[in-house]
Amino acid sequence: MMRIAVDAMGGDHAPAEIVKGALRSIEQFDIEVILVGQPERIKEFLPQGEVPARVRIKEATEVVEMDEHPAQAVRRKKDSSIVVATRLVKEGEADALVSAGSTGAQMAASLLGLGRIKGIDRPAIVTVLPTLEGGKLLLDVGANPDAKPEHLVQYAMMGSIYAESILGIQNPKVGLLNIGTEETKGNELTQATYPLLQKAPLNFIGNVEGRAIPYGQAADVVVCEGFVGNVVLKTTEGLAGALFQLIKEKITATPLRKLGALAIKPGLKEIAKMMDYAEYGGAPLLGVHGISIISHGSSNEKAIFNAIRVAKECVESGFIEEIKKELPRFTAAQE
């Protein structure tokens, strides 16, 4: 049976929402969940304080706080929930890990505990962005604020394999995020990356502007360095929230508008669901030798449930082995 280690102490709403999401996951999936953290706090949110079937508690006495230096905290707090959860994956006691705690700490724990896939210089966080054409991938969204051209090529390769393995997109279109679609546009990084992507065994379609991302037609996988990707991700989240707040204010401003709002309410609910980050669960850290799913710090029960779902799908897909298999072909193309 598949086993998913869940950092029960990580996140703004831990351990309550984490435990709820884990319990919901065992109702839907044939998996075992290992809740990692402080047993007495975890049990407060279990039915009658009892540990149900297919749930196990692994004690971890320490917690990495959000304001701590990630790498230092991971090295110092050997018995923290994120370090212990990562160790379970490394030692084969769990098939994947999920955490809504410090992203930096999870990255550090994953790099130190799981290690990079041989041939991958830097890992990347990949996220699914909602678009008019369904979910599309953006990476890197924060693992590394800076990158070299060869790193972006590796991101493109991993993103392409992930899109095919997890999203079921055949021969995914890969685009390079830029300030214009022309080949000569951009800074030194994008201009140096463009010819490398042209040479790579990918379905590279060229540069993609930021405004094209929400429409989802230009590319299935959009590649950029982590600084830019994180700005795009958080701007998208903020814009979606602001738009829905504005719509709510305007359609309820008068009695007549309120009547009209009733007619469009089902459609608005569908849009809200499509834009809800909790529906997409978590963002995998690609390039490490194990499955490490990074969840939003404010994750609720639904987000944790979906993060566990993503972890399950990653285990089932075997995409890490696919990355290792495809890497030599990409490396040879760059020589």
Curated annotation (Swiss-Prot):
SUPFAM superfamilies: Isocitrate/Isopropylmalate dehydrogenase-like. Pathway: Lipid metabolism; phospholipid metabolism. Its main location: cytoplasm. It is found in: Cytoplasm. Its EC number is 2.3.1.274. One of its GO terms (cellular component) is cytoplasm. One of its GO terms (biological process) is phospholipid biosynthetic process. It is an enzyme of class 2 (transferase). GO terms for molecular function: phosphate:acyl-[acyl carrier protein] acyltransferase activity. InterPro entries: FA_synthesis, Phospholipid_synth_PlsX-like. Keywords: Cytoplasm, Lipid biosynthesis, Lipid metabolism, Phospholipid biosynthesis, Phospholipid metabolism, Transferase. It comes from the Bacteria. It catalyses: a fatty acyl-[ACP] + phosphate = an acyl phosphate + holo-[ACP]. Signal peptide: none annotated. Belongs to the PlsX family. PANTHER family: FATTY ACID/PHOSPHOLIPID SYNTHESIS PROTEIN PLSX, PHOSPHATE ACYLTRANSFERASE. Homodimer. Probably interacts with PlsY. Catalyzes the reversible formation of acyl-phosphate (acyl-PO(4)) from acyl-[acyl-carrier-protein] (acyl-ACP). This enzyme utilizes acyl-ACP as fatty acyl donor, but not acyl-CoA. This is Phosphate acyltransferase. It comes from Desulfitobacterium hafniense (strain Y51).
